[in-house]
Amino acid sequence: MATNSEFLIPARADLAAAREEWLKSLKTMRRLSDNTLIAYERDTRQFLQFLTGHLGEPPSLKEIGNLRIADLRSFLANRRNDGAGARTLGRGLAGVRSLLRHLEKRGLVNAAGASAMRAPRQPKSLPKPLTADDARRVVSADGQMAEEPWIAARNAAVLTLLYGCGLRISEALGLSGDALSDPSARSMTITGKGSKTRLVPLLPAVHKAVAQYRALCPFDLSAGQLLFRGAKGGPLHAAIIQREMQKLRAGLGLPDSATPHALRHSFATHLLGRGGDLRTIQELLGHASLSTTQVYTGVDTQRLLEVYDKTHPRA
């Protein structure tokens, strides 16, 4: 049965029905989230509204089959004039391309050229590092907001791994139950993106935070289990740590930029500020390319001036 959205969009009956079928397939076959489905419905509706004005009449499957890349560029330019940013434009184009590919697979149109158009580049937004003092306050066990002592210790241990070892949150939450069980270990092997392994040094503060958590955790932390657990013993999810970080921001008066990932960024930035070289930091972060590390660390002006004063022949 057709939904109301079919009658609200400016399109001929054949295109409206095909679009409705596409939306249903996204929900049943691809199992996209409700938010993504809502965004795709809205973005394609805006696209069809644009085409109605662009062509002078509501489009049908025939007009969709005659689309050119220039038409999509005009749509993006129109959205940009309305104030849409690069991220919104990219998402909107993704929805339109998904619809076009669906119509092609169904043999309804041939829009290979238009569906191959690339999304506009999105500017990279980097997390802002915390100051060293703020980072220490965030990872302090005494400063955690959780009422349960073992959960407070758990949160402190996770955050300490992000700041003290530069781990991604997924890497910290994926540690096995026997990780860091040897207090004399000076390093551990981490498997990161692309199944690449790297060696990460272990500071005494990291050992201490994990040991305090182990002593209080009521669940089995043997080798076959995960190290970090949720309140009922299941896997600890990143959203929980992000929520705890939100509480810490409010309690400590930190800006919204103080996120779990910002702790990893702070790890790199503070190492660089104390004289660490980019190649070593690249290895510690697990970046495949040095250029990623150069962008990620965001060398501050003071550090650049110090290097300039020490190394430039005319300084």
Curated annotation (Swiss-Prot):
- What species does this protein belong to? Brucella melitensis biotype 1 (strain ATCC 23456 / CCUG 17765 / NCTC 10094 / 16M)
| Active site feature | R168, K193, H261, R264, H287, Y296 (o-(3'-phospho-dna)-tyrosine intermediate)
Enumerate the Pfam families for this protein.
Answer: Phage_int_SAM_1, Phage_integrase
Mind listing the GO molecular function terms for this protein? DNA binding; tyrosine-based site-specific recombinase activity
Q: What functional role does this protein have?
A: Site-specific tyrosine recombinase, which acts by catalyzing the cutting and rejoining of the recombining DNA molecules. The XerC-XerD complex is essential to convert dimers of the bacterial chromosome into monomers to permit their segregation at cell division. It also contributes to the segregational stability of plasmids.
Task: Please report the stretch or stretches of sequence annotated as the Tyr recombinase domain.
Answer: 125-309
By its UniProt entry, which SUPFAM superfamilies does this protein fall under? DNA breaking-rejoining enzymes
Q: Which family does it belong to?
A: Belongs to the 'phage' integrase family. XerC subfamily.
Relate the assembly described in the record: Forms a cyclic heterotetrameric complex composed of two molecules of XerC and two molecules of XerD.
Kindly list the places in or outside the cell where this protein is found, as annotated in its UniProt entry. Answer: Cytoplasm
Name under which the protein is recorded: Tyrosine recombinase XerC
Q: Give the source's domain of life in one word.
A: Bacteria
Which PANTHER family does the annotation name? PHAGE INTEGRASE-RELATED, TYROSINE RECOMBINASE XERD
Q: Which InterPro entries has this protein been placed in? A: CB (IPR044068), DNA_brk_join_enz (IPR011010), Integrase-like_cat_sf (IPR013762), Integrase_catalytic (IPR002104), Integrase_recombinase_N (IPR010998), Integrase_SAM-like_N (IPR004107), Tyrosine_recombinase_XerC/XerD (IPR023009), Tyrosine_recombinase_XerCD (IPR050090)
Please list the residue ranges annotated as the Core-binding (CB) domain: 13-104
Is Iron a UniProt keyword of this protein?
A: no
GO BP of this protein = cell division; chromosome segregation; DNA transposition
Q: Name one GO cellular component term.
A: cytoplasm
Keywords carried by this UniProt record? Cell cycle, Cell division, Chromosome partition, Cytoplasm, DNA integration, DNA recombination, DNA-binding
UniProt-listed HAMAP family: Recomb_XerC_XerD
